[in-house]
Amino acid sequence: MKASMFLALAGLVLLFVVGYASESEEKEFPRELLSKIFAVDDFTGEERGCKGFGDSCTPGKNECCPNYACSSKHKWCKVYLGK
């Protein structure tokens, strides 16, 4: 009983997808869908002038961004709490 319900539901979903794809074929739906799925953001690799939370740092060099401080124990930038 459960298997037949699952197959019926899967068939309806497949029918819906095929119908939608055939209607959208004029708009190049498959190509557009694949390009959106496999799109890679353009990462320029710009470096910041400071290091953010969790970035490795050297204590005493003031490499971390404002509101962060280099932990002398762990050697990474942490949130500076003003102590």
Curated annotation (Swiss-Prot):
Keywords: Amidation, Disulfide bond, Ion channel impairing toxin, Knottin, Neurotoxin, Presynaptic neurotoxin, Secreted, Signal, Toxin, Voltage-gated sodium channel impairing toxin. Expressed by the venom gland. Residues 22-48 form a propeptide. Residues 1-21 form the signal peptide. One of its GO terms (cellular component) is host cell presynaptic membrane. GO terms for molecular function: ion channel inhibitor activity; sodium channel regulator activity; toxin activity. Disulfide bonds join 50-65, 57-70, 64-77. Its main location: secreted. The keyword Repressor does not apply. It comes from the Eukaryota. The modification Leucine amide is found at residue 81. It is found in: Secreted. InterPro entries: Huwentoxin-1, Huwentoxin_CS1. The keyword Signal applies. Negative results: has no activity on Nav1.4, Nav1.5, Nav1.8 and Nav1.9 sodium and calcium currents. The presence of a 'disulfide through disulfide knot' structurally defines this protein as a knottin. Selective antagonist of neuronal tetrodotoxin (TTX)-sensitive voltage-gated sodium channels (IC(50)=1270 nM on Nav1.1/SCN1A, 270 nM on Nav1.2/SCN2A, 491 nM on Nav1.3/SCN3A and 232 nM on Nav1.7/SCN9A). This toxin suppress Nav1.7 current amplitude without significantly altering the activation, inactivation, and repriming kinetics. Short extreme depolarizations partially activate the toxin-bound channel, indicating voltage-dependent inhibition of this toxin. This toxin increases the deactivation of the Nav1.7 current after extreme depolarizations. Monomer. Belongs to the neurotoxin 10 (Hwtx-1) family. 15 (Hntx-3) subfamily. This is Hainantoxin-III 8. It comes from Cyriopagopus hainanus.
